[in-house]
Amino acid sequence: MKLRGVSLAAGWFLLALSLWGQPAEAAACYGCSPGSKCDCSGVKGEKGERGFPGLEGHPGLPGFPGPEGPPGPRGQKGDDGIRGPPGPKGIRGPPGLPGFPGTPGLPGMPGHDGAPGPQGIPGCNGTKGERGFPGSPGFPGLEGPPGPPGIPGMKGEPGSIIMSSLPGPKGNPGYPGPPGIQGPAGPTGLPGPIGPPGPPGLMGPPGPPGLPGPKGNMGLNFQGPKGEKGEQGLQGPPGPPGQISEQKRPIDVEFQKGDQGLPGDRGPPGPPGIRGPPGPPGGMKGEKGEQGEPGKRGKPGKDGENGQPGIPGLPGDPGYPGEPGRDGEKGQKGDIGSTGPPGLVIPRPGTGVTVGEKGNMGLPGLPGEKGERGFPGIQGPPGLPGPPGTAVMGPPGPPGFPGERGQKGDEGPPGISIPGFPGLDGQPGAPGLRGPPGPPGPHISPSDEICETGPPGPPGSPGDRGLQGEQGVKGDKGDTCFNCIGTGVSGPRGQPGLPGLPGPPGSLGFPGQKGEKGHAGLTGPKGLTGIPGAPGPPGFPGSKGEPGDVLTFPGMKGDKGELGYPGAPGLPGLPGTPGQDGLPGLPGPKGEPGGIAFKGERGPPGNPGLPGLPGNRGPMGPVGFGPPGPVGEKGIQGVAGNPGQPGIPGPKGDPGQTITQPGKPGLPGNPGRHGEVGLPGDPGLPGPPGLPGIPGNKGEPGIPGIGLPGPPGPKGFPGIQGPPGAPGTPGRIGLEGPSGPPGFPGPKGEPGLGLPGPPGPPGLPGFKGTLGPKGDRGFPGPPGLPGRTGLDGLPGPKGDVGPKGQPGPMGPPGLPGIGVQGPPGPPGIPGPVGEPGLHGIPGEKGDPGPPGFDVLGPPGERGSPGIPGAPGPMGPPGTPGLPGKAGASGFPGAKGEMGMMGPPGPPGPLGIPGRSGVPGLKGDNGLQGQPGPPGPEGEKGGKGEPGLPGPPGPVDPDLLGSKGEKGDPGLPGIPGVSGPKGYQGLPGDPGQPGLSGQPGLPGPSGPKGNPGLPGKPGLTGPPGLKGSIGDMGFPGPQGVKGSPGPPGVPGQPGSPGLPGQKGEKGDPGVSGIGLPGLPGPKGEAGLPGYPGNPGIKGSMGDTGLPGLPGTPGAKGQPGLPGFPGTPGLPGPKGINGPPGNPGLPGEPGPVGGGGRPGPPGPPGEKGNPGQDGIPGPAGQKGEPGQPGFGIPGPPGLPGLSGQKGDGGLPGIPGNPGLPGPKGEPGFQGFPGVQGPPGPPGSPGPALEGPKGNPGPQGPPGRPGPTGFQGLPGPEGPRGLPGNGGIKGERGNPGQPGQPGLPGLKGDQGPPGIQGNPGRPGLNGMKGDPGLPGVPGFPGMKGPSGVPGSAGPEGDPGLVGPPGPPGLPGPSGQSIIIKGDVGPPGIPGQPGLKGLPGLPGPQGLPGPIGPPGDPGRNGLPGFDGAGGRKGDPGLPGQPGTRGLDGPPGPDGMQGPPGPPGTSSIAHGFLITRHSQTTDAPQCPHGTVQIYEGFSLLYVQGNKRAHGQDLGTAGSCLRRFSTMPFMFCNINNVCNFASRNDYSYWLSTPEPMPMSMEPLKGQSIQPFISRCAVCEAPAVVIAVHSQTIQIPHCPHGWDSLWIGYSFMMHTSAGAEGSGQALASPGSCLEEFRSAPFIECHGRGTCNYYANSYSFWLATVDVSDMFSKPQSETLKAGDLRTRISRCQVCMKRT
């Protein structure tokens, strides 16, 4: 079977083979001849058809890389790529070039007056200057007021008992006194010894009594019985003046003083006294005003640095009570208390209690309660004066309580003096004041040794006050005392003498002049209480008394005490109630749009960026598709919703404190525990804005949502405020976050062109300068541009007296007028002296006017000083005057940057005159003025007694107010020091108050929200703590001038300061319009500069001192002023023609270049004065010009130093000379004569020479003329409180002051209980005049009373008829002894002007006058004959150093020197810097001197100064971020107080990631260390300029290798460099930032504007080809930096 299958298969095969092989055979056997049988077995067939492709094979192994192909052709420019995301912010570029100066800004409005600055540090005492020359004697000043009484002299030795009977020297006759009132008859004296009989005379009528003689000697010690009181005699006529007789004192005769006579009738009232002291303050003080409206929103303050939030401290324990404070100032007068109960009636012992007539006005009781305020009544006419009441002595009433001190009452009209009956006699009073010496008595012959005592004359008026005597010398010691029991035993009182006969009445004499107050007499025994007199006028306020006894009357309010000394610090207070919210800040600017953020890996914490400002919320968009996107930004605060329903009542709170009476808020209690969280109520009303939280940290980026972002929707409208969320639990205390880094400091900018700042506070008064020269009268110039606000000018001259004006009420300020101010008119005729006006009420403060045109009028001629008139009262404010003269130049200010001039502003109104300033120092004597018109003849009055207070001035009913209503809110106070920056809150509507929670700890800061809507201005918050001084801001606008403050207490004069050193000359300031300054000292001669144009001819100056005789030059006459021409366009400079009329200022042309000096032109005539041009901006300070050419003249003989003459007008620079070679110095010639002025030269270039050296101190000048009285200066700042002085003597009454402000209302005291009888109170207020009383019965004749004091001066009596002639008296012998010098007489009238005197003798030659104008160039003279040899001159100044001479010939060979020392003694110092924190080792062969820190360079005042790193100066032994300070010429140094820098080599220490500045100890790892080494030989650095290390020269050894460091710059593109031969140019390590910048505020950091410069590699083949630009990145930096090696010469 198997075999069958095989054969069958073979058969099938053969069949197929046969079928297939037929065509093959045919093909194989092709070519066989037909009929022949071909054998085709085994022949290869033809190529078959291509098969189907096979399956893909497996990839083969990678082949080897082929060779690099050639570079392909440059491809086409590709399409623009899609815009990439914004790159990071680039580093700050270098500062750009300074821009062109901007156009001048308009002048700003005047700024507010700044608050007085703090008191400066007292300067050092200056060195004592040399004694100056004595000045000329000044004119006598006005007579000053009498000085205070001197210190009592030392007690003299006891006087000797002189038993001599010789009379003293006779005094000069005094002035006759006025007639006195006849006194009562004196007691009859003892009969004298019988004199020799006189010649019989006829009996004459009794003569009038004589004037009182000098005090008689003591009477004999006999006492008689007291006689009855005599009737008052009629007034006797004045007696004729007698002559002083020589009186011999009886030996051992003692006189007893008699009883005092009866008091005289009360005289008529005296003349009104001087104006009394200022009355009490006006109306009652109103109640406290309501809270003022909140002020406008202020400008945003500067950002302060964020402080780290501190944890609130616990309240401290109460401290110990402080020391008692100083006495407080006297408080304001309290309200008058209620009336007390009547006092007890204490009957007088020994007398019955009979009710007498109504007594005088009792002491004022306690005031009643305050009534309602009535309307002010119309002032009634003064009532008629009532007659004096009867003086029946009633029993004294009970003493009342001491009343408060009453206010000063109005002075009543003088009463009609109806004399009453005489009262009862009082006890003898105290001895009166000692009267002046009387006139001389009649002569008595010397034979009459004892004179009878005549009847006493009437008391004389007080005499004139004598001059202040000098303190007497200590007297001689007295003889031994015979009666030494104390002060002597008084003898018994003598009997009163018999009453004398009444004299006939004399005629009334003329009234005498009022006498001066006499000296105080000795204190007598205290008399009994006299009859109560009529109420006297109120006295002057007394000085402050000693503290009185404490009266324990309840309810009495004491006066406010003096200001106490500051007490010790009190206990720390408990926390106060929270303050009110501050004002919201301004909204910040809009921030930059952010990029599309894709979620990245969380990176390292970045530097804290500045917080971005939130953008506005966009409008609502359509709903996007896809999953929700990230949380959107917070929208703008929506409109407040309607109030919700009241919430569910919360849990019951802790019981509140029961307050029975509304009091002040109590101390806050301890915080309660947290209650359970209640259910959230419905939303309440929006609450007040809370304090802002601390910004939270930025959250993690959220996971990005899946889905395509939708298109941004439109901005939605503000949503309605949602309900508040549930309250969270209190968070834990957060960790203290790191403080953010300060920003990079910007480069120091160019000086800004700022507007002038507001005027500073008034400077200290300067020293009195010398008088400047008198200027010419100029023509009025066009209005100049307004200059800077000047310092307060010196007081202007006193104006003429205006016409008598009626005092009108102050009108409202008028609107400012518009118009150019014309030149001042001629002075008006002086008007009559005005009547005293009322004190005007200060007007409302006017708005500040815009600045006016500063047109300067021509200066007037100096007037003659008039005779000083009596000071008039203060008149009403006059109309604004014309602008005064410009003030004298102030001291030079600090050097300021030049501001641009602004266009003139419109004129503003004049301000209100300020108060009187502190009197200035007495000026030097002025020159003799022209004689003024004769003034009215005034009589010199002696100093009068302080008069009684005058009647009150007329009161305007509009001004006299009763108690005012509650006042308006006060002006805002002085702004406090700006506090720390507050956060900006969102103002909301006020909500219902919540319960006070426990203060939470600061939570984590959230993301910054959008700016809220601006809230209402909050109430003014409490002043913050004083912040650190911020950067100087731009000058603010000048504020409104505040009301004048109260005058400060004058401080004690300070000790004189040391004179400062002379400062450098500043840049020229803007040419202001002012008086010429004081002439400066003569400087050293500078190089001859280019001459300027000739100036204006000056008017005739004051006569100078005689100069050396010269040939007078031709002086041109001043021409008449021409008419101004129209402004011309700037044309090319023509030939100098004759001077034309001054044209109006033309348009400014372009600045031309400096021309070459032209040849001197012919001398022209002096032109008319041109008009003042507008001052241009100051040019840049030029380089010093080339020395002018010209042959120097021979130096003159040195003159003696004369007195400084009056300053001449400024000289005009002369024409330029031709350039000539420098001549040899000639012999000293004599001074040349003054030549005529030269012609105007071409203008020189506007270059400014260099600063000259300070000249020597010039001799003092002559005293200038006395200036006029200046206007009062501004009120100075209030001085420091002085120490409490000792209690002074009672001063004279002051001038009436203006009505004071109403005081604060005091509390009403409760009525007091009835107290014990008090001591007598103060005098009560003057009562209304009573009705005339009925005359009483005549009283019984009482015992003899003591004589009353002299009544007031009576009215002048009529001149009586002359009496009959008296009989001739006995002829006496005149013994004339010269008396003492009498008091000075009344000054006589000024005499007539005397005739001119004869010419005086020839005066001494005057000092050399000022140099004259330069003369025109003369023709060259012929050679003169050789003069004789002069005397040897004074030694000249040392000459400048000469040029080096040629080398001299070779010297002879010297002897061999001594053996040399070891070469190591000649060490060379080098410095090696490690650039690490470890100090380096000194190289082999050198010795270390010291270690230190590597200082690279410093920068101060924008200028850098570098150190050579190879020298020891670059290795400071101590490190400081500010190792230097700066000093100025004023002996003041400042340290770490400016924007200065220091730069130090640094280490490879990496900066922290935050890049915040390094402070404190964290700076140390960044500062490189260094070592100073001593090498035995010279050390140099060699540089290869390749990357190979160079070899040391032959014979030199290597010390170290490094990189070639060349230069470095940083802030402000300042820096320094290294000498390439110095070892400092070869740093051992290369770093792109090899140094670090440190500042005076104690920080260091790396900054992007710091660059280091390294020597680069140079290929030999590229030495002279263009360098190819190349940028090297990190890693390749060292491939282009040259290498170097430091080598030391072998020794």
Swiss-Prot record:
Q: Where is the segment annotated Nonhelical region (NC2)?
A: 27-41
- Report biased composition (Low complexity) as residue ranges: 52-61, 133-142, 413-433, 786-797, 882-901, 983-999, 1007-1028, 1103-1120, 1224-1233, 1301-1311
Sequence ranges of Basic and acidic residues compositional bias: 246-257, 285-305, 324-333
Q: What does this protein do?
A: Type IV collagen is the major structural component of glomerular basement membranes (GBM), forming a 'chicken-wire' meshwork together with laminins, proteoglycans and entactin/nidogen.
Q: What is this protein called?
A: Collagen alpha-5(IV) chain
Question: What SUPFAM superfamilies would the database entry show?
Answer: C-type lectin-like
Q: Which UniProt keywords apply?
A: Alport syndrome, Basement membrane, Cell adhesion, Collagen, Disulfide bond, Extracellular matrix, Glycoprotein, Hydroxylation, Repeat, Secreted, Signal
Ranges for region Disordered: 49-548, 566-1465
Position of the S-Lysyl-methionine sulfilimine (Lys-Met) (interchain with M-1555) cross-link? K1673
- The gene name reads COL4A5
Disease affiliated with this protein: A defect in COL4A5 has been found to be the cause of canine X-linked hereditary nephritis (HN), a disease similar to that in humans (also referred to as Alport syndrome) characterized by progressive renal failure and neurosensory deafness.
> What residues does the S-Lysyl-methionine sulfilimine (Met-Lys) (interchain with K-1673) crosslink join?
M1555
The record's Gene Ontology cellular component field reads: basement membrane; collagen trimer; collagen-containing extracellular matrix; extracellular space
Q: Which domain of life is it from?
A: Eukaryota
Instruction: State the family named in the UniProt similarity comment for this chain.
Output: Belongs to the type IV collagen family.
Query: Chief localization class?
Result: secreted
Q: Kindly list every residue the record annotates as glycosylated.
A: N125
Gene Ontology terms for molecular function: extracellular matrix structural constituent conferring tensile strength
What's written under domain? Answer: Alpha chains of type IV collagen have a non-collagenous domain (NC1) at their C-terminus, frequent interruptions of the G-X-Y repeats in the long central triple-helical domain (which may cause flexibility in the triple helix), and a short N-terminal triple-helical 7S domain.
Per the UniProt entry, the disulfide pairs are C1482-C1573, C1515-C1570, C1527-C1533, C1592-C1687, C1626-C1684, C1638-C1644
Q: Which residues form the signal peptide?
A: 1-26
Q: Where in the cell is it found?
A: Secreted, Extracellular space, Extracellular matrix, Basement membrane
Task: List, alphabetically, the InterPro entries matched.
Answer: Collagen, Collagen_IV_NC, Collagen_IV_NC_sf, Collagen_superfamily, CTDL_fold
Q: Enumerate the residue ranges of region (Triple-helical region).
A: 42-1462
- Give start-end positions of Gly residues composition bias: 1202-1211
